[in-house]
């Protein structure tokens, strides 16, 4: 599977190393979007009169959680319930899933992102400390082990997930035998409402990396929650430390919504449903997201320029923001990352091997691949995702902030 296809690129852009084809989904960059995100009905550049904009808080204002107004429970309990009730599934079960390759592809994206910044930190220190903010069941433990870090703090709002993460870590240590494994600490906490620095075993701990994968958007229910999560992510970073993560692209979500005839969009893999169109408040812009059998919870739109502005409060500077498509095209040129893509089974072989079926039964899901096969210019099998999976994964972006001295 030497040839890799992205349905969003042009058929004519084929070469002997990586083949990409044009797919039915037309990607539109954020600058093409004219849809307005608003604050109480106002454009971002024009905050409502006689109301204090949350982005203009003075640096000296009290930040202690005890001095903040009490927040309602919000949607956090729904998120906790959902993730606590997700069953543990083995590899055999996962491999039969409609989104087996999609999940592996997203996992590969995280691996490439984490690996990139672990190497950046390693240039200045070998004792790397990491905060995994929204660790879930510990899906990134092997990535941190591969990165050779020294210390990991895992935290999540779902207590069952944290316990499963800790069990995975213990199992990892048992199987490692004489091989050194990083120290780990596990915390159950709502990082949108609780100050993590009051909970660490070492009250003076500093981190080189904070990783927040597919989680930060839950905090955009209110300004206070988004700010608290950002504080937890950034306040204990060393100068030169990084806050990295993945999150849905607000511009892409709004673009697809506005192109839809209803308040929802998606396909047989994922669906997104908003309450209404037209106005998208900076905080509390809720939508319901479902992804096959994995996710079915309320989420909140993230207007990325607001996140960039808020991060300045914690001396954080955005060093890059890339769509999944942009990041994929960059990393797949690297032979090591390309091999990892294959090992992780992040792309589906096309055509399917004898006695095997493609994950999608719809022929239109593979039109992009079939066109290239018919051209006879590539070595088979090709590596790709179905059209439906490409559409699902292309709603995301990756980001990286650096702590300024």
Curated annotation (Swiss-Prot):
Ranges annotated as biased composition (Polar residues): 9-18, 36-45
Region (Disordered): 1-78
Catalyzed chemical reaction(s): a 5'-end (5'-triphosphoguanosine)-ribonucleoside in mRNA + S-adenosyl-L-methionine = a 5'-end (N(7)-methyl 5'-triphosphoguanosine)-ribonucleoside in mRNA + S-adenosyl-L-homocysteine
GO BP annotation list: 7-methylguanosine mRNA capping
GO molecular-function terms, A-Z: mRNA 5'-cap (guanine-N7-)-methyltransferase activity; RNA binding
GO cellular component: mRNA cap methyltransferase RNMT:RAMAC complex; nucleus
Function of the molecule: Catalytic subunit of the mRNA-capping methyltransferase RNMT:RAMAC complex that methylates the N7 position of the added guanosine to the 5'-cap structure of mRNAs. Binds RNA containing 5'-terminal GpppC.
Protein name, as recorded: mRNA cap guanine-N(7) methyltransferase
Species assigned in the record: Xenopus tropicalis
């Amino acid at each position: 599977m030497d040839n890799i296809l992205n349905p969003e690129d042009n058929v004519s852009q084929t070469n002997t190393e990586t083949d990409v084809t044009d797919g039915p989904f037309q990607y539109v960059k954020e600058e093409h979007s004219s849809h307005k995100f608003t604050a109480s009905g106002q454009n971002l550049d024009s905050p409502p009169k006689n109301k204090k904009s949350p982005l203009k808080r003075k640096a000296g204002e009290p930040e202690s959680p005890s001095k903040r107004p009490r927040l309602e429970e919000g949607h956090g309990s729904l998120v906790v319930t959902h993730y606590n009730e997700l069953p543990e599934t083995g590899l055999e079960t996962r491999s039969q899933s409609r989104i087996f390759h999609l999940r592996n592809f997203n996992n590969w994206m995280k691996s490439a992102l984490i690996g990139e910044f672990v190497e950046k930190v390693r240039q200045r220190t070998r004792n790397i400390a990491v905060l995994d903010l929204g660790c879930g069941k510990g899906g990134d433990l092997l990535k941190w082990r591969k990165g050779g870090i020294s210390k990991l703090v895992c935290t999540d709002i779902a207590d069952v997930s944290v316990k499963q993460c800790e069990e995975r870590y213990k199992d990892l240590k048992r199987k490692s035998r004489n091989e050194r494994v990083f120290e780990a600490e596990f915390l159950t906490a709502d990082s949108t409402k609780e100050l993590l620095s009051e909970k660490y075993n070492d009250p003076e701990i500093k981190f080189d990396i904070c990783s927040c994968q597919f989680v930060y958007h839950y905090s955009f229910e209110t300004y206070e929650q988004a700010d608290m999560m950002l504080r937890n992510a950034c306040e204990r970073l060393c100068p030169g430390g990084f806050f990295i993560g993945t999150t849905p692209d607000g511009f892409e979500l709004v673009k697809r919504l506005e192109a839809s005839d209803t308040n929802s969009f998606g396909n047989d893999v994922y669906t997104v449903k908003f309450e209404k169109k037209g106005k998208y408040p900076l905080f509390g812009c809720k939508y319901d997201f479902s992804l096959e059998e994995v996710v079915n919870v309320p989420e909140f739109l993230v207007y990325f320029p607001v996140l960039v502005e808020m991060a300045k409060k914690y001396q954080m500077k955005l060093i890059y923001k890339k769509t999944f498509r942009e990041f994929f095209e960059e990393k797949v040129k690297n032979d090591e990352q390309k091999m990892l893509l294959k090992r992780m089974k992040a792309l589906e072989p096309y055509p399917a091997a004898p006695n095997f079926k493609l994950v999608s039964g719809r022929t239109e899901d593979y039109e992009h691949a079939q066109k290239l096969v018919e051209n006879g210019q590539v070595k088979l099998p090709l590596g790709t995702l179905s059209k439906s999976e490409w559409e699902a994964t292309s709603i995301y972006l990756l980001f990286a902030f650096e702590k300024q001295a």
